[in-house]
């Protein structure tokens, strides 16, 4: 019995391993998550940033052409940073059919084109060692469209405008939003 591993056997087992790994990722729904730009697909969820902070989209309501968002932010940073409305943006991405019947992705709304996001209960907030958390920061985006089937609301928070390659993102589909609102109405909130 020989304990040598031939080139042919190596290639055979390498190919089998590659197929197994590829198959496992397809079956397991493997999805890459950029650590600098984490994404949540739920309302009332929190994300951690490499910039030593945690932010959460606590609540979201769309009614009468206004999208109202409630956010919580916690920091463990030594140096303080300011929260401005321009740190946040909201957009709606939908699916549309062209003249040939092919579906394409379209941007139906972008808050920066509508005057940006506005804070309801603050103008700007300093977050740092002396004030490490902001809870219940409310903001609105106006001229907001009613959600249609296939729409996704993209809510983005960029903590430092000079470091726009770091962001926290929420991708809320119409179905997830409708489910969130239904749960709120049944729980009496």
Where are these regions (language model features)?
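Structural beta-strand segments of beta-rich domains
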Residues: 67-69
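Bacterial signal peptide processing site
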Residues: 31-32
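Bacterial N-terminal signal peptides
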Residues: 20-22
């Amino acid at each position: 019995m020989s304990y040598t591993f031939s080139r042919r056997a190596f290639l055979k087992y390498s190919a089998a391993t590659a197929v197994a790994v590829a198959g496992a990722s397809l079956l397991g729904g493997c999805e890459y998550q950029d650590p600098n730009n984490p994404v949540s697909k739920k309302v009332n969820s929190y994300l951690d940033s490499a910039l030593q902070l945690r932010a959460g989209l606590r609540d979201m309501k769309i009614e009468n052409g206004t999208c109202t968002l409630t956010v919580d932010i916690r920091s463990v940073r030594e140096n303080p940073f300011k929260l401005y409305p321009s740190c946040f943006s909201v957009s709606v991405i939908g699916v549309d059919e062209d003249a040939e019947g092919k579906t394409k992705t379209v941007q139906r709304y972008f808050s920066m084109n509508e005057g940006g996001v506005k804070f309801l209960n603050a103008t700007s907030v300093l977050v740092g060692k002396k004030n490490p958390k902001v809870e219940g920061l409310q903001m609105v985006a106006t001229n907001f469209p009613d959600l249609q089937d296939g729409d996704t609301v993209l809510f983005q928070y960029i903590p430092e405008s000079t470091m726009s390659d770091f962001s926290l993102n929420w991708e809320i589909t119409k179905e997830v939003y409708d489910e969130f609102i239904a749960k709120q109405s049944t729980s009496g909130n």
